[in-house]
């Protein structure tokens, strides 16, 4: 049974089931199918020969049995992801539950499925999984949790329910379909695309109506994500999913890789118009589809409107800024100028005093030290600053960058600015530890902590001079850009932890975030800061700070780990700094004492 024959059967069964759907002859059938009369005549003749139609375009018993055996069995809806591109509205609700015309997207999909008699619906959830629970009562759907949703792509979501794939629709949760894309009858496997050309699409529609896949294609038809997989092809797909998931290199793959790449599945193209199926992947796409959606009323959007005296329609080009260990930031444009909205991440209210941060920004205002600030809320930490176009972070492998950063840091320290709060490293070490819900994962933590805190005596003997210190003076927070005069300048950003402290702490912080593995690298940076004139006492003191700050951020990482956030090599290296530089500092202190 080829695609054309099945299309005719499906059209004629609809005529029998819907009195208002009238087809009296082949010409009317051709109009419904948007085919030529000659093609319809050819297909009808073949169906009659095969015993599926009589002379009056009426389905035979054989045809009805065939169609009854061609009913879809179930549906898998993929709804586990974060929806990162939906900033800022992805922070309170999964995008599957965003409302268009007062109905959540996923509810519209479920009801469209019910319209064609499909009630066996499985939803793969992950981010904010609890928000989907009500659907089990309202629609009798099944929820399956993908525990790896935060670190793997939707190939793994489909793998969680691969045993269910057989005569199955696979549907992404973020689509709004103006007309029902599902049917009571399906026979062959297909994947839905539209007529628009997408430069990043690896599939294109061939003359035979199939999809041709090639990663090397420069462009192809825009992929929607909806597919139907029949029982025969499902066997191949499930095997391919298993093969791909066995290799960690495929963690970021989409499920379509299993469908198209290195398989014998012939996938038909179901081509729709681009305005029939709309993907809602951003705040702006939702606004374009439903400008009255209640989801558009967002706290950060309201702040932007107030600060810049604009409406939400004036806010354009919104996209997430992934960098940042504690914050969820996004970039936006108002009146042709770009800005960054910083929204503090979960749990940061325990770690950062936003009133103190606001005090710091007021203190450094006018010194051309940091990015231009337009708004900061001392209560919730929401912040708007100018986005530096064509900027870049410090390259820790570039000696010129390192020298420039150390000069910027030294010039800032030489201002001797003061605020009314300090950053007490010893208190912070204990504070982060107090947030733990379990013992340290490091077996020798207690001894390591005792050793590192013992360095305080030497630091105090140096009588460090306190001034406003950045604390988080890491390479990523030094932004290089070209100013209006064509000269390169550096802005030091992200002052959340800043307070009164020995300014030499900033040197240690830069080193440990750079993950320097060799002592010579740290010595080189110290020499850049001091122009080669660092005293032995100051050098040892910085070694002490490397150990202390390593323990500090190791404790911070342990707290975040217990919340389910991992930082990989960074967290392991911080603990190593605590242990290794305690030894180095202790040895150098002994040498210094012998010289006295």
Predicted regions and their residues:
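Conserved alpha/beta core of the MobA/IspD/sugar-nucleotide pyrophosphorylase nucleotidyltransferase superfamily
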Residues: 13, 55-75, 222-306
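ATP-binding pocket architecture of kinase catalytic cores
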Residues: 319-426, 439-447
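Active-site activation/catalytic loop segments of kinase-like enzymes and analogous catalytic loops
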Residues: 504-534, 547-565, 579
